[in-house]
Amino acid sequence: LKNGSVLRAHFAHVKLQHCPYHHEAESFEHLELKASLYDWASRESNTEVESYLADFQQIADLLVVDKNLALEVQCSSLSLERLKERSDAYRSHGYQVYWLLGKKLWLKERLTKLQAGFLYFSQNRGFHLWELDLTKKELRLQYLIHEDLRGRLHYQTEIFPFGQRSLLEVLRTPYLSQPMQQMAVELDRTFLTYIQQQLFYRHPKWMKLQEELYLQGHHLLELGLDFFYPLCRPIVSQNLLQIEEDVEGYYQKFMAYYQSQDIQPVQILYPPRFYAQQKS
């Protein structure tokens, strides 16, 4: 790479618009993040930018050649179908792929269907994803991602400044041996009022539950908070495109752990391996 932000961003090779395999306009953020990651990864590994993989006609933003590892810097929205197609193509040809998200795709208060497609899973960090921040020059691991029954996200953050550690070691963080993580979430004491509002506005999710309870001779508004406990739970989605392992056992052990306890003013959340260690 040449010095200077303009030439650096274009990687001192054929301009991308003239590349026969390049079809998408790239933002300044995307170009600069790729350049930063190239600088970081190439310190320890043979790394290529805009690497064309002829076997399945796909371009990797960055390819760590000796590790069969693709790094995709995603700064704009794409369809779930396209995300699945690209992710499956990498895996079926023996490549591991990490999707690293630009600013438009960072986690906010609620998880979108597309963001669910970028989630990874490990026994030590649970559901997690990776964010890139060009302004702060840092890679962020958002982990122990949970959702409460209002649909709001709760998660922890670990920050890795660009270039300070081995990039490959950083990306392995969720899978390395480590102390048990945890996260505290206060009990939502106004949740029953929220339920009342949802029924008033006839929200489909809560109307469906109310209908099921009605057939059993109950009503949502008769129930106490303990019926809904735990109020903060792991992500459940049909769009977990990066996760190949079966997480159903984790869901079951999670629910069994909290339902065996009295309702707590603060819910302490742990990674999957904690629940796996509990005796049933």
Spans of features found by a protein language model:
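Acidic-basic catalytic patches of nuclease active cores, encompassing PD-(D/E)XK
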Residues: 11-49, 65, 280
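A structured, charge-rich N-terminal accessory region that forms the first stable segment of a protein
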Residues: 1-9
